[in-house]
From Swiss-Prot:
The reaction proceeds via a thioester-linked acyl-enzyme intermediate. The keyword Acyltransferase applies. CDD domains: LplA. Belongs to the octanoyltransferase LipL family. The keyword Oxidoreductase does not apply. It comes from Halalkalibacterium halodurans (strain ATCC BAA-125 / DSM 18197 / FERM 7344 / JCM 9153 / C-125) (Bacillus halodurans). InterPro entries: aa-tRNA-synth_II/BPL/LPL, BPL_LPL_catalytic, LipL, Octanoyltrans_LipM/LipL. Pathway: Protein modification; protein lipoylation via endogenous pathway; protein N(6)-(lipoyl)lysine from octanoyl-[acyl-carrier-protein]. This is Octanoyl-[GcvH]:protein N-octanoyltransferase. It catalyses: N(6)-octanoyl-L-lysyl-[glycine-cleavage complex H protein] + L-lysyl-[lipoyl-carrier protein] = N(6)-octanoyl-L-lysyl-[lipoyl-carrier protein] + L-lysyl-[glycine-cleavage complex H protein]. GO terms for biological process: lipoate biosynthetic process; protein modification process. The record marks K160 as: Lowers pKa of active site Cys.
Amino acid sequence: MSLLLQQHLSQPWRFLDHTSFGPTFQALQSFAYDDTLCTSIGKSQSPPTLRAWVHHNTVVLGIQDSRLPQIKAGIEALKGFQHDVIVRNSGGLAVVLDSGILNLSLVLKEEKGFSIDDGYELMYELICSMFQDHREQIEAREIVGSYCPGSYDLSIDGKKFAGISQRRIRGGVAVQIYLCVSGSGAERAKMIRTFYDKAVAGQPTKFVYPRIKPETMASLSELLGQPHNVSDVLLKALMTLQQHGASLLTESLSADEWLLYEQHFARISERNEKLLAE
């Protein structure tokens, strides 16, 4: 049993299930939710929270992506794939969200000594514990050729199925992961490759954008050779929390948190419009 998980999970955890809100649930709302949770948990007004979320056919761009020379052509290409496009309020590059991708946010208070690496390791250990039978196969290292590459890409046999990011604001930490549960990892990667082809168009860029190789990405269903869906992977997450001492609470947001959420959502939406209009 992971000591890191035991240390952070053996306490009451609130669980928010945002996996079945449907196509009208916007990805911008998720970033507003996590900023809200960071704020209230950072002030010790709410317990640590696991939030599970699913969005339909959306590509989330990083701020650097939004400054590519032919960004409007890139966005039009994504719309041609029937995907909405937003720019997120934190670092990283383009990622795909759809009904076969489960996102998990572990939101907790930023305690002294809880480093950036500790945040990444906490999520990595959670995923390894969820898929205990495959623990030895799951690696955390950058997968060159994947979209949104990073040192905590999770892969099996060199094929990436998940990426971890982290946001720290107002005394709270949100460690977020997207898990490609079902569908084709390569097809998602081909769409992002098309985006970069159109948005870069052979012109100089201010950052090194990823050269996408679709064969470097796959879903858990493809990698494990058996069908998985969002619901059964979420159940694994909840069971793993309980196995490490968490008592799960199913309270919704408090009245104060709803007010905060509305403020965060308005701010994030306005910022997103500005970034897409530049």
